[in-house]
Amino acid sequence: MTTTYVKKFDGNTAALGRTLVLFGGTSSEREVSLRSGAAVLQALQAGGVDAHGLDVQADAIAKIEAFAPDRVFIALHGPGGEDGKMQAVLDWLAIPYTGSDHAASALAMDKLKTKQVWQSVGLVTPEYASLVENSDWQAVLDSLGGQGFVKPAHEGSSIGMSVVSTAQELKAAYEKAAHYDAKVLVERRIVGREFTVAVLNGVALPAIGLKTDHVFYDYDAKYVSNTTQYLCPCGLTQEKEAELQSIAQQAFAAVGCKGWGRVDFMQDEAGNFYLLEVNTVPGMTDHSLVPMAARQSGIEFNELVLEILAQTLV
């Protein structure tokens, strides 16, 4: 397992040519993406890259073709930008781009399919059930130990998520999640500590521990609250952090991801780790976790952005 990051970008910004940063879009994560894109664009321009931004709307493909960039930095979050669709368009246009390819992006965006892949290779993820309009709410909840997390299968940033402990709450949570996605799942609730591990160019960066006074690490805790605590160093022993980083790399590879991303975990009270999801285009805002982990590895934000973009030179 590799956990010591060696910078790969040689500083030759001329080799990057004209770069287009894609952000915004039309998903429920648009506001976060606008912030990520603005930060990335500013960092690239500060680093001497000929970088330009595009808020992705209905005419985005024509605008990308007209601009004819040498490479693209994808800072789109959620459906339409993180789910393989934009990646497939860029493949068709033969334009190099940051992050995972269209197949891995589509798989990682689907929490149900991702969990199935992880289970098939022996990686541990919380027990779960798919929900439909006429599910037996009590039976589902009983099968998961009486408490669950309800999630839209294709949303990020904890959008549409709920914690439930009664059949009535489960039904209401399903209806809330179904507003965002036709595919909804409920996971067994793991009580314990939450961690995340960023992966950059095959290297697992230092883990981050998350503490919030909310019921769970929801949208407000991620992007608005000033009371959320980010622990880096994460508070685990060296051995347990190494175990967590190893699982993150295995989970990342199992889905076929490459370049950069982030893997989220829960740790139960017995010390066992459970995989929650993988993010192929993590946030790059002032509250974001990948820049925090990179900083712990001696990589400042502007350097991190260049390291991610330099993946397109390979």
Swiss-Prot record:
Residues 115-310 form the ATP-grasp domain. Belongs to the D-alanine--D-alanine ligase family. Cell wall formation. One of its GO terms (cellular component) is cytosol. Mg(2+) 2 binds at residues 277, 279. SUPFAM superfamilies: Glutathione synthetase ATP-binding domain-like, PreATP-grasp domain. One of its GO terms (biological process) is regulation of cell shape. It is found in: Cytoplasm. ATP binds at residues 141-196. Its EC number is 6.3.2.4. It comes from Saccharophagus degradans (strain 2-40 / ATCC 43961 / DSM 17024). Pathway: Cell wall biogenesis; peptidoglycan biosynthesis. Gene3D superfamilies: 3.40.50.20, ATP-grasp fold, A domain (3.30.1490.20), ATP-grasp fold, B domain (3.30.470.20). Binds 2 magnesium or manganese ions per subunit. Pfam families: Dala_Dala_lig_C (PF07478), Dala_Dala_lig_N (PF01820). Mg(2+) 1 binds at residues 264, 277. Keywords: ATP-binding, Cell shape, Cell wall biogenesis/degradation, Cytoplasm, Ligase, Magnesium, Manganese, Metal-binding, Nucleotide-binding, Peptidoglycan synthesis. Its cofactor is Mg(2+); Mn(2+). This is D-alanine--D-alanine ligase. It catalyses: 2 D-alanine + ATP = D-alanyl-D-alanine + ADP + phosphate + H(+). GO terms for molecular function: ATP binding; D-alanine-D-alanine ligase activity; metal ion binding.
